[in-house]
């Protein structure tokens, strides 16, 4: 089966402390790798100002993950858990060209 490269960008609430943010990022990195993702690259883009308010916040901490997977299981599980977690304001997943 062909492997697909994915890029997941998500925004964390700006008022979360540094230790909690690191734990959140580590937890979601683990969720993705536990569900079959390989070659995980996880980067912090830092705090950025929004063009409009999201849930009464004017800024947020951006984080991006890039990984390869044989199926959509890591993406589906990340999406499910990120919608439940109230520390994540938004997320977006993109399928990248090879």
Curated annotation (Swiss-Prot):
**Matches recorded under InterPro entries:** Ribosomal_bS6, Ribosomal_bS6_sf, Ribosomal_S6_plastid/chlpt, Transl_elong_EF1B/ribsomal_bS6
Q: Which Pfam families does the record associate with it?
A: Ribosomal_S6 (PF01250)
GO CC terms: cytoplasm; ribonucleoprotein complex; ribosome
Gene3D superfamilies, alphabetically? 3.30.70.60
Alphabetized UniProt keyword annotations? Ribonucleoprotein, Ribosomal protein, RNA-binding, rRNA-binding
Which PANTHER family does the entry mention?
Answer: MITOCHONDRIAL 28S RIBOSOMAL PROTEIN S6 (PTHR21011), SMALL RIBOSOMAL SUBUNIT PROTEIN BS6M (PTHR21011:SF1)
Described purpose of this protein according to its UniProt entry: Binds together with bS18 to 16S ribosomal RNA.
What is the recorded name of this protein? Small ribosomal subunit protein bS6
Q: Which organism is it from?
A: Lactobacillus johnsonii (strain CNCM I-12250 / La1 / NCC 533)
């Amino acid at each position: 089966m062909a492997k697909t490269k994915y890029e997941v960008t998500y925004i964390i609430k700006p008022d979360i402390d540094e230790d909690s943010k690191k734990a959140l990022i580590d937890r979601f990195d683990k969720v993705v790798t536990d569900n079959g993702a390989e070659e995980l690259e996880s980067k912090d883009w830092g705090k950025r100002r929004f063009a409009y308010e999201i849930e009464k916040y004017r800024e947020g901490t951006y984080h991006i993950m890039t990984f390869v997977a044989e199926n959509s299981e890591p993406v589906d599980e990340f999406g499910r858990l990120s919608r439940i977690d109230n520390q994540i304001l938004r997320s977006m997943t993109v399928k990248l060209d090879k």
